[in-house]
UniProtKB/Swiss-Prot annotation:
<feature type="short sequence motif" description="Antp-type hexapeptide">
    <location>
        <begin position="164"/>
        <end position="169"/>
    </location>
</feature>
<comment type="function">
    <text>Sequence-specific transcription factor which is part of a developmental regulatory system that provides cells with specific positional identities on the anterior-posterior axis. Controls development of mouthparts, and labial and maxillary palps.</text>
</comment>
<dbReference type="GO" id="GO:0006357">
    <property type="term" value="P:regulation of transcription by RNA polymerase II"/>
</dbReference>
<dbReference type="InterPro" id="IPR009057">
    <property type="entry name" value="Homeodomain-like_sf"/>
</dbReference>
<keyword id="KW-0371">Homeobox</keyword>
<keyword id="KW-0217">Developmental protein</keyword>
<feature type="compositionally biased region" description="Gly residues">
    <location>
        <begin position="452"/>
        <end position="463"/>
    </location>
</feature>
<dbReference type="InterPro" id="IPR001356">
    <property type="entry name" value="HD"/>
</dbReference>
<dbReference type="InterPro" id="IPR001827">
    <property type="entry name" value="Homeobox_Antennapedia_CS"/>
</dbReference>
<feature type="DNA-binding region" description="Homeobox">
    <location>
        <begin position="198"/>
        <end position="257"/>
    </location>
</feature>
<dbReference type="InterPro" id="IPR020479">
    <property type="entry name" value="HD_metazoa"/>
</dbReference>
<feature type="region of interest" description="Disordered">
    <location>
        <begin position="1"/>
        <end position="23"/>
    </location>
</feature>
<keyword id="KW-0238">DNA-binding</keyword>
<dbReference type="GO" id="GO:0048728">
    <property type="term" value="P:proboscis development"/>
</dbReference>
<dbReference type="InterPro" id="IPR017970">
    <property type="entry name" value="Homeobox_CS"/>
</dbReference>
<feature type="region of interest" description="Disordered">
    <location>
        <begin position="251"/>
        <end position="336"/>
    </location>
</feature>
<feature type="compositionally biased region" description="Polar residues">
    <location>
        <begin position="322"/>
        <end position="336"/>
    </location>
</feature>
Length: 782
C-alpha cells in the first residue's frame, strides 16, 4: 500500500491512509473496479476518513451516511481483506501496516511524502460495499493504483467536493498533525472517532525514543517528575507518554522477572533484569562466617578478639616478630585477604580473612573466630596463610554451615592467641565449651593454622602454659620446623608455627612462651604436667593434657602440641602418635556431635594431631584438649561443615572429612593439615584421604578413629612437621567430648590421623595433593 500510495499523486490520500489505516487487511488490489455505489447500498466514505480514499460500505452499511454513489468509481478493489472494522472506523489505512496506526514512523513519513494536501481527496466518498458485496472502495489517493485521482471527484458529491463531515475533518486534522508530529515524533497519539467516540490510537515510538527510554529505564525504573519532563522534552514526547511508557515497561519487566523477586529493579530480562538481578542478587557477603557462633563473633570481628589476644598474643607473638601484632596484622591480613597475605597476617588472612577474601568457610570461621587466631597465626600461620588461602576457597562450602567450626578452626589460632593470656584460656575454653563450634573454632584456628601448627598463634594463645613445652617443642620444632620451614616456605605455617610457637610460645626465642608457660600454667593448670608434655616427647601427652585443659582454652596446648609436632614431628612419636591417634580417633566417634561439643574440637585437634601426627600430629594429639581449639580453629570449620569448613580452606578440604570427621569420628581425614600429606590418606575419612597421607597414617584409615584406642597421651608426637592445621578435626570428634579431657591424646592421635587424611577435603583436594606431593610442610599451605 505504501508503495502504491507513494506512487499515487493523490496526496492526502496516502497520508490519510497512513495515519488512519488501522487495518492491515486493507489490501488494495491494484485492479481497478468500478462498482455502482448505489448498488452497494450505503456507500461509505471510508476514504474520507482514512484519507485513504477507500470507502468500504457494506450494502447495509452507509458509511457516514454518504449517499450511494451511482457513478462508478474506479477503485482498487479492496478485497474483503479489508477489515470490516475499517468500515466501522470509517477510515482505512491503506498502508499494509494498517494494524499499527502510526506505529512506524516510516509509514508516517511515507504518507507525508504523498501530497499531504490531498486529505480532502482522501476523504472522497467511496461507496463500496466492503462486505464483499462489492467493494466499491473509493480509494482516492493511495489506494487506487493507477486509479486516477480525478476519479474521486466523480463521486456524487464531487470527489473533491465531497462534503466533509465533522468526523472527516477531525480525522484529517489529527492525521495531519500526527503526520507532522510523527516525523519528528513517532509517538503520535491520534484520536480517531469510532462510533462517534474518540479513540486514542496506539502511540508509536521511534527507535531513538525507545532507545533513550530503555536506557533511562535501565538506570531508573521510576522517574521523578523533573526527570520525566526532561525526557519528554528531549524525546519530543508528552509527559504522559513517558509516564505510561515507564509504567508499561515496569510491568513488562515484572513479568520477565517474576521468577526473580527483583522485578522492579531489574529492567529487562535482557537489560534491566539481568543487570538488576545481578546487582540485586545478594552478593556474597564477604563474611560468610558472620553466622559463626556468638563465641566466635569476636573473631568475626577479628579485631576484637585479635585485640584481646593481642596483648597476650602480642606478648607471645612479639618474639614472633612483626607478625606479632598478629591481631592487627592478622586482621589486616585477614581483611585484606587470605591468599594474598604474604605476611603472617596473610597467613592468618586465610584463616581470618577468609571471611572477606575467602568468603568461604574461612570467612565465617575466620571472621568469627579467626581474628585472634589469625593474629596468632599471623606469625605462626603464614604457612597456614598459604594453606589457608587456598584452603579458604575450600572453606566456602562448609564454611557457612560450619561457621562455628570454622570459627573454632580459626579460633584455634585465635584462641591460642588468646590463650597467651589467661583470659584467652578462659575464653578459649569457654569458646570451646560454650559454643562447641564457636569455641572450637577459635582454638582450631590456631591449630588449623597450625598447620602452622604449633607455632601458630594458637600455640601461644593455646598453650600459654603449654608453651614452655612449646619452647622445647619449638626448639625441637625450630630445629625440625626450621628445617621444615626452610624446607617449605609453604610450610610457613610451620614456620610461622614454629616461629610463632617458638616466638610465640616461649619457644626458644620467646619470652612469650614464658608467659605462655604462665598461661600454660593457667591453662595447663588442669594438667600441670603438660609442661613435661610440652617437652617434645611428652608434648603429646602434654598436649593431651593441654588438650584437656585447652580444649576449652582452645589450644594453647594445641599450638604447642602442634609446634612440637611440627618440631619433633616426633616421628617416633608420630608412630606412637599414630597409634595414639588411632586410639584417639576411635574415641572421637562423635564426629559431628563431638564437633558440637568439645569433641568436635577435639576432633579438630584430633585431626590436627593426626595431621600433626603426620607432620606434627603429636602436638595436636597432645593438644587434643586444646586441640578443640586447634581443631576448631582449623578443623572447626571443617568440622562444622565437613567439607566446607575449610576455614583454613585447605584444611577445610578435609571438610568432607569434616563432616565425616564429625561423623566419622572426627572425619579424621580432615586434616586440614594438608600438611599431613605424609600420612597416607588411609585415614578412614573418605574425603580426607587426600590429606591424610600422614605417615602416621597408620591410624589413617579412619582417622585414627579406630586408632582412637591408641595412645591417648602419647599421641602427641606425630611430628609431621607440616602442619597441624590439617589437624584432625575429624579425628577429634569423639575425642572431643571426652577426648577433651582425655582425648587430648587420644583424640589428638585420632585427630592427627584424621586430620592428616582430611587435610584437604573437597576444596583443597588439589592442595592436599600438592601438599601430599610436596610434604606435610607443604600442607601448611593447605
Amino acid at each position: 500500500m505504501q508503495e502504491v500510495c507513494s506512487s499515487l499523486d493523490t496526496t492526502s490520500m496516502g497520508t490519510q491512509i497512513k495515519s488512519e489505516s488501522p487495518l492491515n487487511p486493507l489490501q488494495v488490489q491494484t485492479g481497478q473496479t468500478s462498482l455502482p455505489v448505489g448498488g452497494c447500498g450505503g456507500a461509505g466514505v471510508v476514504g474520507g476518513v482514512g484519507g485513504v480514499g477507500v470507502s468500504v460500505g457494506q450494502p447495509g452499511i452507509g458509511q457516514q451516511g454518504v449517499p450511494p454513489v451511482p457513478s462508478v468509481l474506479m477503485v482498487n478493489k479492496m478485497t474483503p481483506n479489508c477489515d470490516k472494522r475499517s468500515a466501522d472506523t470509517a477510515y482505512w489505512m491503506t498502508a499494509s501496516e494498517g494494524g499499527f496506526i502510526n506505529s512506524q514512523p516510516s509509514m508516517a513519513e511515507f504518507l507525508n511524502h504523498l501530497s499531504p494536501e490531498s486529505p480532502k481527496i482522501g476523504t472522497p466518498v467511496g461507496s463500496g460495499a466492503i462486505g464483499g458485496v462489492g467493494v466499491n472502495v473509493n480509494v482516492n489517493v493511495g489506494v487506487g493504483v493507477g486509479y486516477p485521482v480525478g476519479v474521486v471527484p466523480q463521486t456524487p458529491d464531487g470527489m473533491d467536493s465531497v462534503p466533509e463531515y465533522p468526523w472527516m475533518k477531525e480525522k484529517k486534522t489529527s492525521r495531519k498533525s500526527s503526520n507532522n508530529n510523527n516525523q519528528g515524533d513517532n509517538s503520535i497519539t491520534e484520536f480517531v472517532p469510532e462510533n462517534g467516540l474518540p479513540r486514542r490510537l496506539r502511540t508509536a515510538y521511534t527507535n531513538t525514543q525507545l532507545l533513550e527510554l530503555e536506557k533511562e529505564f535501565h538506570f531508573n525504573k521510576y522517574l521523578c517528575r523533573p526527570r520525566r519532563i526532561e525526557i519528554a522534552a528531549s524525546l519530543d514526547l508528552t509527559e504522559r507518554q513517558v509516564k505510561v511508557w515507564f509504567q508499561n515497561r515496569r510491568m513488562k519487566h515484572k513479568r520477565q522477572t517474576l521468577s526473580k523477586t527483583d522485578d522492579e529493579d531489574n529492567k529487562d530480562s535482557l537489560k534491566g533484569d539481568d543487570d538488576q538481578s545481578d546487582s540485586n542478587s545478594n552478593s556474597k557477603k564477604s563474611c560468610q562466617g558472620c553466622e559463626l557462633p556468638s563465641d566466635d563473633i569476636p573473631d568475626s570481628t577479628s579485631n576484637s578478639r585479635g585485640h584481646n589476644n593481642n596483648t597476650p598474643s602480642a606478648t607471645n607473638n612479639n618474639p614472633s616478630a612483626g607478625n606479632l601484632t598478629p591481631n592487627s596484622s592478622l586482621e589486616t591480613g585477614i581483611s585484606s585477604n587470605l591468599m594474598g597475605s604474604t605476611t603472617v597476617s596473610a597467613s592468618n588472612v586465610i584463616s581470618a580473612d577468609s571471611s572477606v577474601a575467602s568468603s568461604v568457610s574461612l570467612d565465617e570461621d575466620i571472621e568469627e573466630s579467626s581474628p585472634i587466631k589469625v593474629k596468632k597465626k599471623d606469625d605462626g600461620q603464614v604457612i597456614k596463610k598459604e594453606a589457608v588461602s587456598t584452603s579458604s576457597k575450600a572453606s566456602p562450602f562448609g564454611y557457612e554451615n560450619s561457621t562455628p567450626s570454622l570459627v573454632s578452626f580459626r579460633r584455634d589460632s585465635d584462641a591460642s592467641a588468646v590463650g597467651n593470656a589467661p583470659t584467652s584460656k578462659a575464653v578459649g575454653k569457654k569458646r570451646f565449651q560454650s559454643a562447641a563450634n564457636a569455641i572450637a573454632t577459635p582454638t582450631p584456628l590456631s591449630d588449623s593454622n597450625s598447620g602452622n601448627g604449633s607455632g601458630g598463634g594458637p600455640a601461644g594463645g593455646y598453650f600459654p602454659g603449654y608453651y614452655p613445652s612449646p619452647k622445647q617443642q619449638q626448639q625441637v620444632q625450630q630445629q625440625q620446623l626450621h628445617p621444615q620451614q626452610q624446607q617449605l616456605p609453604q610450610q610457613q605455617p610451620q614456620d610461622y608455627y614454629g616461629k610463632y610457637d617458638i616466638e610465640f610460645a616461649a619457644s626458644p626465642h620467646h619470652n612469650p612462651h614464658n608467659k605462655q608457660q604462665a598461661l600454660h600454667g593457667e591453662y595447663l593448670s588442669p594438667k600441670p604436667s603438660s609442661a613435661n608434655f610440652h617437652q617434645n616427647s611428652q608434648q603429646q601427652q602434654q598436649n593431651d593434657h593441654f588438650y584437656y585443659n585447652y580444649n576449652d582454652t582452645n589450644g594453647t596446648p594445641y599450638l604447642n602440641h602442634q609446634q612440637q609436632h611440627h618440631h619433633h614431628a616426633q616421628h617416633h612419636q608420630q608412630q606412637q602418635h599414630h597409634q595414639n591417634h588411632v586410639a584417639d580417633f576411635e574415641g572421637p566417634v562423635n564426629g559431628p556431635s563431638n564437633f558440637n561439643n568439645g569433641a568436635y574440637y577435639d576432633n579438630m585437634s584430633f585431626q590436627q594431631q593426626a595431621q600433626a601426627h603426620q607432620h606434627q600430629t603429636v602436638v595436636f594429639q597432645q593438644q587434643q584438649p586444646h586441640q578443640p581449639a586447634a581443631i576448631n580453629h582449623q578443623h572447626m570449620h571443617h568440622l562444622g561443615n565437613g567439607e566446607t569448613y575449610s576455614a583454613l580452606g585447605l584444611q577445610m578440604e578435609n571438610c568432607e572429612g569434616y563432616n565425616n570427621f564429625g561423623a566419622a569420628g572426627t572425619g579424621g581425614g580432615y586434616y586440614e593439615a594438608g600438611q599431613q600429606p605424609p600420612i597416607p590418606a588411609t585415614h578412614g575419612h573418605g574425603h580426607h584421604p587426600h590429606h591424610v597421607q600422614v605417615p602416621a597414617q597408620a591410624h589413617a584409615p579412619i582417622h585414627a578413629h579406630h586408632n582412637s584406642a591408641a595412645i591417648p597421651g602419647g599421641v602427641g608426637v606425630g611430628p609431621p612437621p607440616s602442619h597441624i592445621h590439617g589437624f584432625a578435626i575429624n579425628g577429634g570428634p569423639a575425642v572431643q567430648g571426652q577426648a577433651f579431657g582425655n582425648n587430648g591424646s587420644t583424640a589428638a592421635g585420632t585427630a592427627a590421623i584424621s586430620g592428616l587424611e582430611n587435610s584437604n577435603s573437597s576444596d583443597f583436594n588439589f592442595l592436599s595433593n600438592l601438599a601430599n606431593d610436596f610434604a606435610p610442610e607443604y600442607y601448611q599451605l593447605s
